[in-house]
Amino acid sequence: MSFEINRNILIAVDESENAQRAVTYVGKLLGGIKGFKVAVLHVISEPEEDYFQSESDKDKWYKEYRQQVDQMLEKYRNILIDTGFDPGDVLVRSTIRYCPSMAECILAEVDQTEYSTLVVGRKGLTHKEEFLFGSVSGKIVRTARNCTVWVVE
């Protein structure tokens, strides 16, 4: 019996060094191996409606933040290409969502796409902080279904 392995990988990122390490890890591990497709995703957590004084303030914030995110995603894309991924096999994208939990938003993206592996960086929390506040990667590991999760230290 043979079956086709889904080689689509989603890397959920933010601006942290841990996220960059996750991207670099995937690049060094799989770059140059044919058949893998990688998407780098940044979820922009939409602020509460009353966070901004006006709609124009919200638009200005979104435009400026989107520019930062686009630069970050391009940097991560280049890391993957420089480590051997074909440019056509690397997708970067951001999405804005209302996120009561960032982990839930990331897992919703996995559920809506064809990615079988989710890669996240481990947040640099102490054990005490992680116990008190939890972590995105910890919640993803506990609640992910129908995908493999890699947590990069």
Regions found by a protein language model. Give the residues of each.
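Gly/Ser-rich helix-loop-strand patches that form or flank binding pockets
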Residues: 110-153
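Small/aliphatic-rich secondary-structure junction motif
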Residues: 2-59
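Short, well-ordered amphipathic alpha-helical segments that serve as non-catalytic structural scaffolds
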Residues: 22, 72-77
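General small-molecule cofactor/ligand-binding pocket signal
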Residues: 39-41, 91-95, 150
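Structural beta-alpha unit
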Residues: 1-4, 81-117, 138
